[in-house]
Regions:
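Catalytic phosphate/metal-binding cores of nucleic-acid and nucleotide-processing enzymes, i.e., regions
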Residues: 1-117
Length: 117
């Protein structure tokens, strides 16, 4: 990312951060070597994914009836004994309170039930 693009992204994030109905996060993608193992580790959502990822709370109004809108989904995967951290609980609560679909999946069936598919 060029210096100009970095400055622009910072300015956009500051401006958008003033809106309580928005939650956006910087999404850097790439690969780096793990300093412990030397193996390459990918990070970020996916190659080609956008710089800012998040959600906007939208109130559904009568004129929107029949339209399709995307809904943010956040599923935390845990083993049978795995426990959510406070940070993970806070994340899920914020997404849920903003209208997203959230849940903890310990099995494939859990994930399917969370998404009602």
């Amino acid at each position: 990312m060029s210096n100009q693009e970095t400055v622009l992204q910072q300015n956009i994030r500051l401006a958008l951060g003033q809106h309580s109905d928005l939650r956006l996060f910087r999404n850097e993608t790439g690969k780096l070597p793990d300093p412990r193992t030397g193996r390459w580790v990918q990070f970020g959502l996916a190659k080609g994914s956008s710089d800012l990822i998040g959600f906007k709370t939208v109130k559904i109004t009568p004129e929107m009836i029949g339209q399709e809108v995307a809904q943010f989904v956040s599923i935390e995967i845990k083993t049978e004994r795995g426990k959510l951290t406070n940070v993970q609980q806070n994340w899920l609560q914020k997404v849920k309170s903003s209208g997203g679909i959230v849940g903890v999946a310990r099995t494939v069936k859990d994930a399917l039930q969370i998404l009602k598919v």
